[in-house]
């Protein structure tokens, strides 16, 4: 009820917030400030579910947009059981809607960012993925596929650079000035050549592991015969 004196009108004070309505969660933070992490928004609903909204990668001068890569770190109390929902998988490819997830999509978790374990997800209404995690420690990495980082690429180049069958050449630069490189494996005078592209998108790490494995396989002793012709 309002009351009034000669100089002012004063509204009644709002009732104090009910502490029972405060969301109780053992989550401390969703961290994305590290190499190859995917940017996202997140919030906790009234049931304590952590809702994560991936941010689309938009193609220049095109309606196309894509998501499919997620990589973040959960920081929470040890022993916590958390439920998470991932959304924003309404991709657009050549002007048509497409989705990178389904009822067969898995998720990967890791305590150290090196050793990964696959866990199931539930494909729920709204083209979303729902899954649960148990916090053995205070940090847990979550990803769509085992991430392939710039540091992984640098390690590979260092590993193979002195091999006489390898040549690493800079062929251009990215829009931010980073070098674009091509790795030749084999005899430069061979009659046949195969061109394989990797690292086209940061959110497509699976192909990077395949190409790295192919390079290592070809450079092994039993693989050299394929490089001679």
Residue ranges with predicted function:
Residues 1-229:
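M14 metallocarboxypeptidase catalytic domain recognition
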């Amino acid at each position: 009820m309002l009351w009034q004196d000669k100089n002012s009108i004063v509204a009644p004070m709002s009732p104090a917030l009910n502490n029972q309505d405060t969301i109780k969660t053992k989550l401390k933070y969703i961290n994305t400030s590290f190499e190859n992490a995917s940017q996202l928004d997140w919030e906790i609903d009234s049931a304590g579910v952590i809702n994560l909204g991936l941010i689309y990668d938009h193609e220049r001068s095109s309606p196309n947009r894509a998501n499919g890569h997620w990589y973040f770190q959960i920081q929470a109390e040890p022993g916590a059981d958390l439920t998470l929902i991932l959304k924003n998988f309404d991709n657009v490819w050549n002007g048509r809607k497409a989705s990178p997830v389904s009822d067969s999509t898995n998720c990967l978790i890791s305590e150290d960012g090196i050793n990964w374990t696959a866990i199931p997800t539930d494909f729920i209404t709204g083209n979303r993925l729902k899954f649960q995690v148990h916090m053995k420690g205070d940090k847990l990495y979550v990803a769509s596929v085992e991430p392939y980082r710039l540091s992984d690429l640098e390690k590979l180049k260092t590993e193979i650079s002195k091999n006489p069958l390898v040549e690493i050449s800079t062929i251009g630069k990215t829009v931010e000035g980073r070098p674009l490189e091509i790795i030749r494996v084999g005899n430069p005078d061979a009659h046949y050549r195969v061109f394989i592209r990797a690292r086209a998108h940061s959110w497509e790490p699976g192909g990077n592991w395949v190409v790295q494995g192919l390079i290592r396989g070809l450079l092994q002793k039993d693989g050299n015969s394929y490089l001679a012709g």
